[in-house]
């Protein structure tokens, strides 16, 4: 079994507030290409954390690819309360993250800041690599996860960057 964690920018972090934004289709093209590459190299599990934005778009692509490839999808939420306060539209997305092959809640609820690092350590230990939409030019809290991932020997990291997206949009 080979599992890849999929995470990246949330939609608000890159200024995408509408699913019909033309940038979403370019991002999804890149996701499709990269996920197919993973599947053709033996990956059989895609792991999500349940965030809006990149993960949401990658989940949509992964669900489409299930028709062609034998893959499994899991969502491992940080807290059981994840998304409880989202609006109705986003609740629909949350239900998609819960309608996968495996769902787990790492903690019942928030108690202390160390839960975040424990959660990311768990994800790193349970996956062989990560596919991350991230660019050092636009830093977010993902930088802490990426630092941990880069420090792990043999952990495979594939970054989808703004430069790669620009190249794809021009071709």
Curated annotation (Swiss-Prot):
Pfam annotation, one family: YpsA
Family assignment from sequence similarity: Belongs to the UPF0398 family.
Protein name as catalogued: UPF0398 protein SpyM50438
């Amino acid at each position: 079994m080979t599992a890849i964690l999929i995470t990246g920018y949330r939609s608000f972090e890159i200024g995408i507030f509408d699913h019909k934004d033309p940038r979403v289709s370019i991002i999804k093209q890149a996701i499709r290409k990269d996920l197919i590459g993973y599947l053709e190299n033996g990956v059989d599990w895609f792991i999500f954390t349940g965030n809006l934005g990149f993960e949401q778009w990658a989940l949509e692509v992964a669900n489409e690819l299930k028709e062609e490839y034998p893959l499994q999808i899991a969502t491992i939420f940080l807290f059981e309360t994840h998304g409880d306060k989202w609006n109705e539209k986003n609740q629909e997305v949350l239900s998609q993250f819960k309608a996968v092959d495996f769902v787990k809640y790492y903690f019942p609820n928030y108690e202390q800041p160390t839960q975040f690092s424990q959660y990311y350590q768990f994800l790193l230990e349970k996956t062989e690599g990560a596919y991350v939409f991230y660019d050092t030019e636009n830093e977010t809290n993902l930088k802490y996860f990426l630092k941990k991932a880069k420090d792990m020997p043999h952990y495979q990291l594939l970054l989808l960057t703004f430069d790669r997206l620009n190249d794809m949009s021009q071709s």
